[in-house]
Regions:
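Radical SAM enzyme [4Fe-4S]-AdoMet core and its adjacent flexible, acidic
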Residues: 1, 39, 48-51, 71-252
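Conserved SAM/AdoMet-binding glycine-rich loop
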Residues: 1-84
């Protein structure tokens, strides 16, 4: 179904003949590099001259952990976002995670010397939750470490995303991982003009959204939805134009 959807959208153009489909984003309901048909998806996109926008947990399993595998991803993606959750939750040792990020950047540096530009951007994706954003002082110091790591390697961007809960989530889960909005505001200020400001790494993510994606209307359209130009294609082929997790997995189903 993914092939049919990609081919259909890739054929649509605006009034000036420009293709409307800009990139393809593999689902992050699992590790994309472990999907049985990921290589097929990559081939379809390469044939259509489309870039992938990839989010990975940083494990780079199988052939994707080799230099040639990383180089192929760098040439086929518009952005490779590496999530920090994999080592925060114990799924991947930090030493292996950081080593893989360093190797990816080394591969990009070598490839840039040969091919020039046109290679993928590399980003870190950080989820802000109650276990890493417990109080102001500790959170700023923790975030400084991530920023320094990114700056030293030449990472292009850090996506800072707020934790999102479903309505049915238990109070204990919210108490453990929830974050006071005042701390989010403090982080924004520190990143824009304080101790976390960086001249080398760009910042993005839901921390900077005008409207919290977790609070948007489930039944309607948000006033300023950052995903309004995206189409979500499910395994059975049906399409969705709203990424709100409450709409898909909350009590509304």
């Amino acid at each position: 179904m993914a092939r049919a959807a990609i081919e259909r959208y890739a054929s649509e153009c605006d009034e000036y003949g420009n293709r409307l489909l800009r990139e393809v984003i593999p689902s992050t309901m699992g590790e994309p590099l472990l999907y049985s048909k990921f290589n097929e998806l990559l081939q379809v996109c390469e044939a259509k001259s489309l870039k992938l926008n990839l989010t990975t947990n940083g494990s780079f399993p199988g052939p994707w952990g080799s230099d040639s595998g990383m180089e192929r991803l760098l040439g086929s993606c518009s952005d490779i976002k590496i999530s920090t959750l994999s080592y925060e939750t114990g799924g991947l040792p930090y030493s292996l995670w950081s080593e893989n990020v360093e190797r990816l950047m080394q591969c990009r540096n070598r490839a840039e010397n040969v091919t020039g530009n046109g290679l993928s951007k590399v980003s870190l994706q950080v989820t802000l939750h109650g276990q890493n954003a417990a109080n102001e002082m500790a959170t700023v110091e923790w975030a400084k470490g991530i920023v320094r790591f990114a700056e030293n390697l030449g990472i292009d961007r850090i996506k800072w995303n707020r934790v999102v809960f479903l309505e049915k989530n238990s109070p204990s889960l919210r108490e453990r991982f929830g974050v006071d909005n005042r701390l989010f505001e403090m982080l924004r200020q520190e990143m824009q003009s304080g101790a976390l400001r960086s001249s080398k790494v760009k910042y993005g993510g839901s921390l900077f959204f005008e409207q919290d994606a977790g609070l948007c209307s489930v039944g309607g359209k948000c006033d300023a939805c950052p995903f309004e130009n995206e189409v979500w294609v499910w395994p059975d082929g049906h399409e969705d134009h709203c990424p709100n997790p409450e709409r898909r997995w909350g009590n509304s189903l």
